[in-house]
């Protein structure tokens, strides 16, 4: 899953439209943030709709143990966190669920990987130099898969990959909560296609 779409505040009932858009555009991984209303039921519904199409459905913004428990119970296929928390990383790794914790400093990147992270999410990367920061981290951390997150959009996505990011994740630049609430999946699809085309 080199590219992950972040669904924050996706409304209940939009799952089929979301999956249809992902299939149409070629997106293979989506995550629902756990601070979204009805996150667990949305994850379960998305997973049911996405499974026939080979789209992975995960949980994001997993900050506490209870979030992880709910995400796993809902059927999340991977876990993403905004920070480096020992408990979440270890429990996910023990459960053999791919875990991508958030980190920012070199110390956090190494710590997250040592604890069992599948990859490490550099967040918020746009606030600390963007692609140049990924390039700087890539030097000493050649063995650690890095995900760029924070401000990733069609204009800069390719730059992150060129700088050494293995994975990209994006939220409001594509999955704008207002567009999802309005059911404007056509505009979302247009933005998503533009981003995916930029990294082909």
Positions of PLM-derived features:
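Conserved N-terminal beta1-alpha1 strand-loop-helix module at the mouth
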Residues: 1-74, 94, 143, 154-155, ...
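Glycine-rich beta-to-alpha transition loops that act as phosphate-gripper elements at the mouths
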Residues: 8-11, 59-65, 81-85, 101-106, ...
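Glycine-enriched alpha-helix->loop->beta-strand junction motifs that scaffold or abut catalytic
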Residues: 23-28, 50-53, 73-79, 94-100, ...
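Distinct, well-ordered alpha-helical segments
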Residues: 42-47, 113, 134, 160
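Glycine-rich phosphate-binding active-site loops on the catalytic face of alpha/beta enzymes
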Residues: 78-88, 121-130, 165-185
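Histidine/lysine/aspartate-rich catalytic loop segments that bind and position anionic ligands
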Residues: 85-119, 123-128
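Hydrophobic secondary-structure block in the mid-to-C-terminal portion of proteins
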Residues: 134, 139-200
């Amino acid at each position: 899953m080199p590219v992950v779409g972040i669904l924050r505040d996706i409304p209940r009932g939009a799952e089929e439209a979301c999956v249809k858009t992902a299939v149409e555009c070629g997106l293979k991984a989506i995550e629902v943030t756990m601070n979204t209303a009805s996150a667990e039921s949305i994850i379960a519904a998305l997973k049911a709709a996405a499974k026939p199409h080979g789209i992975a459905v995960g949980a994001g913004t997993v900050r506490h143990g209870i979030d992880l428990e709910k995400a796993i119970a809902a059927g999340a296929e991977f876990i993403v966190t905004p920070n480096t928390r020992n408990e979440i990383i270890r429990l996910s790794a023990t459960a053999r669920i791919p875990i991508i914790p958030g980190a920012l400093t070199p110390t956090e990147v190494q710590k997250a990987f040592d604890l069992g992270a599948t990859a490490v999410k550099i967040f918020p990367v746009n606030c600390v130099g963007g692609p140049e920061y990924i390039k700087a981290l890539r030097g000493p951390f050649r063995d650690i898969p890095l995900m760029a997150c924070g401000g990733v959009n069609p204009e800069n996505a390719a730059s992150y990959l060129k700088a050494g990011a293995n994975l990209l994740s994006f939220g409001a630049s594509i999955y704008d909560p207002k567009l999802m609430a309005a059911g404007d999946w056509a505009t979302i699809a247009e933005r998503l296609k533009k981003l995916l085309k930029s990294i082909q």
